[in-house]
Amino acid sequence: MIKVQEYRGHIRNWEELCERLGISLLLPRKEREEEILVKAYETWGYEMADHMHGMFAFALWDEENNQLFCLRDPFGTKPFYYYETEDGTLLYGTTIRKIMEQPGFKKELNEEMLQLYLSLTYVAGENTFFRGLKKLMPGRYLIWKDGDRKSVV
């Protein structure tokens, strides 16, 4: 069973995907888009982003394979962050605040990123102002299986 754990965004080609995946066009937007995510993952797996157009970031829990699949749209319009705690727990979300509020998050300033920001006036790459907190880069996905980051592709 696939469960949507986190979702933020809008799928622009939802009508086409509903027809291809056998989803009712009459569902409310939130329910419809979550159903699209589940069916697209079941149908295309990690290649699901190749079929979706829009701005989105999400996390799906694949109960059968005991893994979390996180994906960010190719343009990076919607953010997605992740953080591994000292005990190996993955914290994730579409806002930094959500992650900061969870047990195990350490608020440690990433001084290197602050220095880069003050020099370049933007934050480049996957690092953030908090040590250990990473951005999932645009068009990339993260697989977390059995308490271990398997890949960021």
Regions from the PLM with identified roles:
Residues 1-153:
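Cysteine-centered catalytic environments shared across enzyme families
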